[in-house]
Amino acid sequence: MLKIITRQLFARLNRHLPYRLVHRDPLPGAQTAVNATIPPSLSERCLKVAAMEQETLWRVFDTHPEGLNAAEVTRAREKHGENRLPAQKPSPWWVHLWVCYRNPFNILLTILGGISYATEDLFAAGVIALMVGISTLLNFVQEARSTKAADALKAMVSNTATVLRVINENGENAWLELPIDQLVPGDIIKLAAGDMIPADLRIIQARDLFVAQASLTGESLPVEKVAATREPRQNNPLECDTLCFMGTNVVSGTAQAVVMATGAGTWFGQLAGRVSEQDNEQNAFQKGISRVSMLLIRFMLVMAPVVLIINGYTKGDWWEAALFALSVAVGLTPEMLPMIVTSTLARGAVKLSKQKVIVKHLDAIQNFGAMDILCTDKTGTLTQDKIVLENHTDISGKPSEHVLHCAWLNSHYQTGLKNLLDTAVLEGVDETAARQLSGRWQKIDEIPFDFERRRMSVVVAEDSNVHQLVCKGALQEILNVCTQVRHNGDIVPLDDNMLRRVKRVTDTLNRQGLRVVAVATKYLPAREGDYQRIDESDLILEGYIAFLDPPKETTAPALKALKASGITVKILTGDSELVAAKVCHEVGLDAGDVIIGSDIEGLSDDALAALAARTTLFARLTPMHKERIVTLLKREGHVVGFMGDGINDAPALRAADIGISVDGAVDIAREAADIILLEKSLMVLEEGVIEGRRTFSNMLKYIKMTASSNFGNVFSVLVASAFLPFLPMLPLHLLIQNLLYDVSQVAIPFDNVDEEQIQKPQRWNPADLGRFMVFFGPISSIFDILTFCLMWWVFHANTPETQTLFQSGWFVVGLLSQTLIVHMIRTRRLPFIQSRAAWPLMAMTLLVMVVGVSLPFSPLASYLQLQALPLSYFPWLIAILVGYMTLTQLVKGFYSRRYGWQ
């Protein structure tokens, strides 16, 4: 029974945390594993559109091949709305206010308030109502601010689509980069490798277009999409080869398409409107919050009944005992936790944005601080984001203009995703030569790049009788489809001797830190029709183009800073192991034994996990290799970050605890990431890690303070309840004490953090929290018991008639010691001298202490059932507080030496 109640309470707590802020959004479509019903009308409409001729498409969608003009766009948007999913639309303010109220802590307070009102204790009911109001409003305001900050940050890195629009009254059109929420049905858009499908589309032109639909269909392999259907009698819209759906992504190829549905009208939009709850795997932050919350709630559920039984049995007044036990339960619940978490994360996100780090999901900040392994690609991270074409040689290593011109034709005429290598090739040919080449050779066709083949081809023609296929790509993949080489002007077979020559030349280039790309050609009789991958066979190896990818000046100090921060950096690259090892050496990273992709193919998960733990450099990896390595490192208990910006990085970005990409990354990589860097630099990343640790430390302060003081208070209550003939403190006193303490905690997100607390990864550790409670909780109990003795024997408050004096004395000691513990526990150093809190926290705690001491002397004292304390009480109060702080400091020194300090 206890387990069921605990689970239900925690479920309510977890729902209370701002879901959209501390849960990573699944890729659009990823949640459709939940069975949901699609309206038959939508399926029928999709099937009709899939089979339509282009002329019919223009008519049905009120569009035309030139694109929509401004007036047509306005009409379409008025009819269909913005291209946003239902779940992305903000809820009304009153819904947010209700969500902020309905947490187990406020419900407990409300029950207690109702009981107080029913027993005509109106003042207590008013105080409880004030507590509920403050807790709810603070959380509401902080969540609203956090939501606004998160939305503003997300808007800075929103995805775009390439759209054909009419741009003036003369009917001139142009391809424009527009945010995807501006798309309307009838728009014509262009797709390329790496693009997210921004709406439901009907393909009108396609070139080797392959789309990953696993998020919708579960099919792991990409499927080809075409402009004219090959299966006219298809019954399942998701299997129609002329349709693409929102939430899927382009793996390879290019296309043009007409937008047939946006927002709620899309296939995924219909699913999102019908799916109310999805199972989301918790990341490291969410698991930590879950474990800590469960620990505190279980402690509350165990101790409150114990307090009830002891007080009811010893005092005989079970009704009063029940009220007191319920007040103790309220005092044991960390009702400010949601607000502290939300405001701390939001403040960290805003600070990071000023350091060129955009946080898409607020919990990523804490994961930043917890990260102990960073896996990253080499290009643009360790190296400069500018690649220089250094050599263009034949197979013997001699400079060759012919090889350069072949590479230029390939880079110039390909329409897929142009990378830094293509840019370097295009810049490596002067304008005169480029004009001559483009005038002499006409493009016939292309075979786009994909990560399975790791090469791409264009087909060009100089005359009408012969076509030339020009292929460039990774050396081994090019060699796999070559049977001949061009050697000293002659075409000779690619035999073992030639292969050894090729390896010798390319290894020499690799050792110089040059990245080698092979170039091959093939002459074919002119023909009609498309060229396919099968045509990439029996090629002639022409030579190589070699690129210099020099390390950044900031890489070495950034790696040193990351190492000093307790983060292990691992390089996961698709590049050659020789090039990667050279770069690692130049930046001071000890690569050790290098593991290549083919080495891990046959390894079991356990063997690869052990290998991954001790290996720094992995080379020649596929996207699935990267994902598998990241997943296994997580399985071993590490908090893993992955930094990448390409299509091949998306699976690993998604698998990591924290996915990190850059503003210039492809759509699918940015969508999969939790954090976007406006500057692709490890130094910026290191600053983010430090901010994450500051954020975590401030959150942990609240939990440690609350847990330890609550533990001590309960122990004190149990002792007092067992031996006193009256309640040690009235339920109302506990509530006021709790309210004042909560007010003092509001400033924790603004507190300073000691340098030593941000020098290593910070992890949630419920076991450490339990140990912390056991060590520090009894300290307050010791001085509470001394206070009991003081009030009983020195001030003779030992009868029911003098219980108000007793309760007033413990009220002041309890509140001041509970407030001072904030300063004692926030640092492992000597508080106020070696480490001072930020001024907001100093001011709030001082204010609460002044209010606490003043209440027994105020006009409210009689209403609160407190009384003025004699002046002789205050020297004893100072002695108790000094003794309390001294013992806490001594225990803190022992604890930090024995167990460390978070």
Curated annotation (Swiss-Prot):
CDD domains linked to this entry: P-type_ATPase_Mg
Keywords: ATP-binding, Cell inner membrane, Cell membrane, Magnesium, Membrane, Metal-binding, Nucleotide-binding, Phosphoprotein, Translocase, Transmembrane, Transmembrane helix, Transport
Binding site for Mg(2+): E335, D645, D649, N713, N738, D742
Residues exposed to the Cytoplasmic side: 1-98, 142-291, 340-699, 749-770, 823-835, 891-902
TM region positions: 99-119, 121-141, 292-312, 322-339, 700-719, 729-748, 771-794, 804-822, 836-855, 871-890
Residue ranges annotated as Extracellular topological domain: 120, 313-321, 720-728, 795-803, 856-870
Top-level EC class as recorded in UniProt: translocase
GO cellular component term of the entry, any: plasma membrane
Domain of life: Bacteria
Cited function: Mediates magnesium influx to the cytosol.
Record-stated family: Belongs to the cation transport ATPase (P-type) (TC 3.A.3) family. Type IIIB subfamily.
Name used for this protein in its record: Magnesium-transporting ATPase, P-type 1
